[in-house]
Amino acid sequence: LSKKQVISNGADKLNELKMSGVDVVIMLCTGTFPEWQDFKGVLFPSNTLSSMVKGCLPTGKICVFSPLQRQCAASQLRWEENGYDVVSLSLLPNATKEEAVLAGQAAGRHDLDLIILDCISYTNETKKIIRETAGVPVILGLSSAIRTALEMVE
């Protein structure tokens, strides 16, 4: 689905979920959805990820991975606006092990404090490979939302 399609039908779906008793909904995209910021109980991974990163590293040098090269400039700007020195690289979420190793090596050349996998589709396996290759902590976008959701429902 395109973001446009999601936005056009999403408000109705969110209301349906609320009416059916759902307390917490995770938006499965690390993009921004300003149209829905007022929905109570909707977790936006872009927000949870940003907050988690800020809590772990108030300032410093980070590498942000985005799926497509054309997304890197916007991603870099977003994280720079949060006060970070940013290296922005692309890596497809379905990258092979070899591609993930190369990405980790590329990131590792930048004397980083933290790496962010800024797409819901990145996996724990990719996170592990990049962490081992680059030698710095890695935060997975989906993990930030799931950990927050658990706090809200437990």
Q: At which residue positions do the language-model features occur?
A:
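Non-catalytic structural scaffold of enzyme domains
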Residues: 1-154
